């Protein structure tokens, strides 16, 4: 597996033009795309395919999240989170956060943005109102069953820590689940005490973790590695015990997962097969759409009717009708899109 930091495939920088000064408010339905190779957040209209503006977003932005009137962008190469005001995108705040922020998760009840730090093996807590770091939780050096290293396929340097890449918050707000690339497990942080509790086994090359709509399970997508470390299934874990209760066939290198809020449908993408796959609530496959090898980001829009599928190699975001899997549009000309957030 040719992987860069945090399991993100490395891309050479591009010579895109400098971002224009942000202008109008970001309207509901617009896409905010983290352009890794351009150091920008691209704002795009999914209906027309037009890129409306680009906003400077730190070095190598790789994650994006919309929360409480702001777009948060994790700058994986610069140790900062960029916050863009949705009502006035000329208001941009840079928040210094650790070494390499990748996973982002927001707790609206507490007003806290959780930031997974890949190289520091830590979880940072950012006060969303103050736009400042207020606490850091350090993960233990060893993970599930005392793991300290990734498998050979995914190793850069031995013993470099847990390498958190994705986060999910328990619906009760008491636990944070952290999918780790280095020890291919799921760390659990008790948010009341700030302490890590027993980890769950995970997946090689994790990319995304979700709490299921009913709160009973964790959905874990991973791209795997080489040989026996290849992953072609979506892993479903019991949220109480961590036991893997189901392996759902998707295709080679499962790079993303999304679920309807009522649990009636689930979608996943197979990066190396280039397919978007749909399932019903009982995990019966209901359809496939071929979008091309390299698709590595999957997001369900707030309207619950539209899927956004990014291809960081091809520089595209595909707009797909969720119920029918019909391809509605493709946004071209993006500089290694790594994540997508949708304005609600």
Spans of features found by a protein language model:
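Predominantly soluble domains enriched in secretory-pathway, periplasmic, or organellar proteins
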Residues: 1-344
């Amino acid at each position: 597996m040719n992987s860069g930091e945090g399991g993100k495939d490395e891309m050479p920088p591009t010579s895109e033009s400098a971002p224009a000064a942000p202008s109008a408010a970001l309207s509901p339905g617009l896409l905010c795309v983290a352009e890794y190779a351009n150091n920008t957040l691209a704002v795009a209209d999914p209906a027309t395919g037009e890129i409306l503006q680009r906003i400077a977003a730190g070095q190598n932005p790789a994650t994006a999240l919309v929360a409480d009137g702001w777009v948060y962008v994790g700058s994986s190469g610069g140790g900062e989170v960029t916050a863009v005001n949705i009502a006035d995108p000329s208001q941009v705040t840079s928040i210094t956060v650790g070494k390499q922020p990748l996973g982002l998760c927001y707790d609206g009840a507490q007003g806290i943005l959780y930031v997974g730090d890949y190289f520091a093996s830590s979880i940072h807590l950012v006060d969303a109102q103050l736009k400042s770091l207020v606490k850091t939780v350090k993960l233990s050096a060893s993970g599930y069953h005392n793991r300290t290293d990734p498998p050979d396929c995914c190793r850069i340097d031995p013993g470099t820590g847990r390498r958190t890449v994705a986060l999910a918050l328990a619906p009760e707000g008491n636990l944070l689940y952290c999918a780790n690339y280095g020890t291919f497990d799921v760390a659990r942080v008790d948010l009341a005490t700030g302490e890590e509790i027993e980890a769950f086994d995970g997946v090689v090359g994790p990319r995304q973790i979700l709490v299921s709509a009913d709160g009973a399970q964790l959905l874990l997508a991973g791209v795997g590695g080489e040989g026996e470390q290849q992953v072609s299934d979506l892993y479903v874990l019991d949220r109480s015990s961590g036991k893997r209760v189901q392996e759902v066939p998707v295709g080679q290198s499962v790079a993303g997962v999304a679920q309807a809020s009522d649990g009636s449908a689930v979608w996943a993408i197979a990066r190396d097969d280039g397919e978007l796959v749909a399932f019903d609530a009982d995990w019966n496959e209901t359809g496939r759409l071929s979008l091309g090898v390299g698709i590595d980001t999957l997001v369900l829009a707030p309207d619950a009717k539209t899927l956004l599928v990014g291809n960081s190699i091809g520089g595209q975001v595909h707009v797909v009708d969720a119920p029918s899997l019909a391809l509605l549009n493709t946004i071209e000309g993006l500089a290694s899109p790594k994540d997508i957030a949708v304005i609600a």
